[in-house]
Amino acid sequence: MTEAQPDKKTAILDTALVLFTTRGFQGTPTSLISREAGVATGTLFFYFATKEDLIDELYRVIKSEAGAAINDGIENKNSIKEKICRVGKNGISWGIKNPEKMQFMEQFAHSPFVSTTAHEEGMSHFLFLQELIREGIKEGVIRNYDPDLLCMMLAASLSGLIARVTAEPDPKKRGLLVGQGMEFLWNGIAA
């Protein structure tokens, strides 16, 4: 038996992303995903036993990609503030470049269609942020609040900032909004 080609798996995931964000989970049958991806339905089921497995894998892949993107370059920064600002700017950049992935994460972040295991695996890519916040609390530069709460508040604020920056057509104003947003984010958690 010949193994299916890896690019077919990518085509399935890319197609599922578009369809799930535009039609929802319930409104997206596997037959449509297969047809739009240009693969046989059997090929889809070769990679993903169920539609739930497909959405779990898509969730994990996107979370992994986002986590790696926002973590990029923080080791080169000296202070906690610089690291948090780098995380924020990386998140904004990734979100602007990946609007469908942002929409998917927002749409399925608390969805019962994504398994608890996939949620936990997805969030594991952001543990560095909790550690960074704990370090900031220990140093006295970040408020002594629950680190999970601070992470959630940062994520929600970044999501809103990405939406606002994305909607702004003027590049100069976009830069101003990013600066104001980062100042707001830091001031919200600074001790």
Label each region the model flagged.
Residues 102-106, 117, 145, 174:
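Short, hydrophobic secondary-structure boundary micro-motifs
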Residues 57, 71-97, 151-154:
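Hydrophobic alpha-helical connector segments
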Residues 37-48:
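Short hydrophobic/aromatic patch on the recognition helix
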Residues 64-67, 71, 97, 114-139, ...:
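Amphipathic alpha-helical packing segments from all-alpha helical-bundle domains
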Residues 95-113, 163-167:
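Amphipathic alpha-helical segments used for helix-helix packing
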Residues 2, 86-89, 93, 127-139, ...:
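C-terminal peripheral helix-coil segments that are non-catalytic and often amphipathic
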Residues 1-23, 28-36, 53:
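Basic, helix-initiating cap at the start of DNA-binding domains
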Residues 55-62:
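Alpha-helical DNA-contacting segments of helix-turn-helix folds
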